[in-house]
């Protein structure tokens, strides 16, 4: 991620290669898994999958159709679980359950009721987000929904575990600097790659709530379903004065963090990036 979108990677033939925030640091594909019982399916949801990608996984594994999963999610009773209290009252959220579908390995009956499938994912998240974590969020002056939103950005930005808490510090520092927007490229991709594909007639509305080059502060909600490492990083950011960072999108995924824009540009140049 290149905060302020200031840099692009230069290739050997002097063309630009833009950063793909979905590029994994480890294997992040949710594949079909063979089970001994033909009536069940074991499904692994990787960290960082969106609600829509989870729906594809369910269809690929015969659990339920993608369309039925999305429909059930969009009409889900948000009063069913206490952990959803924040999102129930949130404004301008496109996918209310985004961020609350915990990434893990599950076993489902094939041709399941999609609402029952969603129940299991949300219930697992509720069990993992402990009272201590809720208290920590409150001590930071943040709601569970806000912490999850930060965690989802961390999940999409970080290439290595060490980068998570540093990225977390950058996000909170920018949030606390009232005149600065987050300007995270991954939120733009969520608008164009998820919201616009699902709701093309609503993208002009939602881009003002999710595109952090446009909106002030956090997007309206999470942009993926983060894992525990990113959630913990959102709850325990490093103590820094950093406002910018650049990450090499190729191994070993080296990164540079800075407190000033000029230093950020220097870091981009040193790492082989060029200002737009």
Predicted region positions:
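N-terminal, intrinsically disordered, polar/charged segments of Gram-positive cell-envelope systems
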Residues: 9-44
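C-terminal motif of bacterial Sec signal peptides marking the signal peptidase cleavage site
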Residues: 4-6
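Glycine-rich loop/hinge motif
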Residues: 36-63, 136-144
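Extended intrinsically disordered, low-complexity coil regions enriched in Ser, Thr, Gly, Ala
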Residues: 63-74
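Bacterial extracytoplasmic/cell-wall-associated proteins, especially those involved in peptidoglycan
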Residues: 62-64, 78-276
């Amino acid at each position: 991620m290149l905060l302020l979108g200031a840099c692009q990677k230069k290739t050997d033939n002097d063309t630009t290669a833009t950063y793909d925030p979905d590029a994994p640091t480890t294997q992040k594909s949710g594949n079909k898994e063979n089970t001994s019982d033909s009536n069940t399916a074991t499904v692994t949801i990787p960290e960082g999958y969106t609600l829509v990608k989870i729906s594809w996984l369910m269809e690929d594994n015969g659990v339920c159709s993608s369309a039925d999963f999305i429909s059930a999610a969009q009409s889900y009773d948000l009063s069913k679980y206490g952990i959803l209290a924040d999102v129930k009252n949130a404004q301008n959220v496109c996918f209310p359950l985004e961020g609350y579908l915990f990434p893990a390995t599950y076993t489902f009956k094939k041709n399941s009721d999609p609402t029952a499938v969603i129940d299991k994912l949300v219930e697992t998240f509720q069990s993992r987000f402990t009272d201590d974590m809720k208290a920590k969020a409150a001590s930071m002056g943040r709601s569970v929904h806000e912490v999850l939103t930060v965690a989802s950005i961390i999940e999409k930005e970080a290439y290595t575990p060490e980068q998570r808490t540093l990225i977390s510090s950058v996000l909170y520092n920018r949030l606390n600097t009232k005149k600065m927007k987050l300007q995270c490229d991954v939120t733009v991709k969520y608008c164009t790659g998820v919201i616009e594909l699902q709701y093309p007639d609503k993208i002009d509305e939602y881009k003002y709530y999710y595109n952090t080059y446009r909106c002030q502060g956090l997007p309206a909600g999470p942009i993926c379903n983060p894992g525990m490492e990113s959630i913990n990083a959102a709850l325990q950011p490093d103590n820094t004065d950093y406002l910018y960072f650049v990450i090499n999108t190729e191994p070993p995924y080296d990164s540079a963090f800075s407190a000033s824009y000029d230093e950020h540009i220097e870091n981009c140049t040193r790492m082989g990036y060029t200002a737009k």
